[in-house]
Amino acid sequence: MFERISIDASICHGQACIKGTRIPVHQIVSMLANGDTIEGLLRAYPHIEREDINACLEYAATLAEEQVTSIEKVAG
């Protein structure tokens, strides 16, 4: 599903990273949230591509999806 994101226990303590790098997804998302632009990130990290940044955002969005469990289902 996330071809550009990797999770490896031996890299960055198992944090999700841009594949082939040690750049954690949370770092990219945080930088964007703090006002950095995609163009600025591409200049700061010339070895990544726009698609890598988009993959970080997609990954973060997936993690942020709410999982709603009905109380009736839990109570039985």
Locate each region found by the language model.
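Amphipathic, hydrophobic secondary-structure cores in small proteins
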Residues: 16-18, 23-59
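C-terminal structural segments of small proteins and small subunits
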Residues: 48-76
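Basic, low-complexity segments
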Residues: 1-15
